[in-house]
């Protein structure tokens, strides 16, 4: 996939509108995970080196088109400032005369971060007038926000049609790594798909079907698959409306020669909290009044053997309720197995990344995708509006 590149563009003295994904967790006014900020630093450093005057835009959370101090980028700017050597300014407005004035006062290599673009409802509406007001801040547009590329918003899609537009280094890397998974994976290709709901993963499972050799299922979504096979699941999470599709996927895997694996044992709890009583049960099923909270040791062992021999691994979604320590062992074991593998490894989704960090093995993963919903949609084979807007620039 060809996207317009920054490397050979003269940016000296030019105002560059850089859309990033600084949608990071903030607690008590402090950023608790800097991963997404750190991932876009190579693009920012390249722009500084080229003498650009950088205007950074991002969203944070869901303020529903209204100014809400809880979702201000101010604490994010504080963290960002500590990671770059350049002078960083913060605009409390997104558009208008004050923001334009600040953008024009920037010197080469300096940075202006504007306030949360979602403080304006027009942002998510991809309003042409709002896109035009954003474009008034800059001469050139760069999109490095792969995590927001699946949204057709003003700052990800609308503005790209009004200014010379380029992809940032992170955007390029994400597209390159995920495209390689879909088109030329080293074999065997193992996909590990977890998380709580089948409904959010059914499309990616379907798209991966003709590409993977092994499909390892875990997390709450596994219980819809097990229920579809009439295996007792007690009070475990189940999406009844997806039972038929889950059963059809199991059947389809058998016909296609894909090794689709489901948990054969479970760590169960009698309630959904840290105070829950726990026990281990095998494939005979889960008792009424109990719910599956993690994969068991036999399942871990089965999955580890497949992971060990993989050529390529894609992991999205935890194996259990890993936020609770007593139900974290399955996810932690899979994280360590993936890290130990000699395969090319790609991990996507907030919970999987949190698990990799919790296990202390992030540095052993080939590529950690910042995408979340965007990487899932890409793996579903869908077109991402933020990427398509850049592609159109290359064909114009």
UniProtKB/Swiss-Prot annotation:
Keyword Transport included in the entry's annotation: no
Keywords: ATP-binding, Cytoplasm, Glycolysis, Kinase, Nucleotide-binding, Transferase
Enzyme class: transferase
Enzyme Commission designation: 2.7.2.3
Catalytic activity: (2R)-3-phosphoglycerate + ATP = (2R)-3-phospho-glyceroyl phosphate + ADP
GO cellular component: cytosol
Any single biological process term in GO: gluconeogenesis
GO molecular function, one term: ADP binding
Protein name per the record: Phosphoglycerate kinase
Organism: Leptospira interrogans serogroup Icterohaemorrhagiae serovar Lai (strain 56601)
Gene: pgk
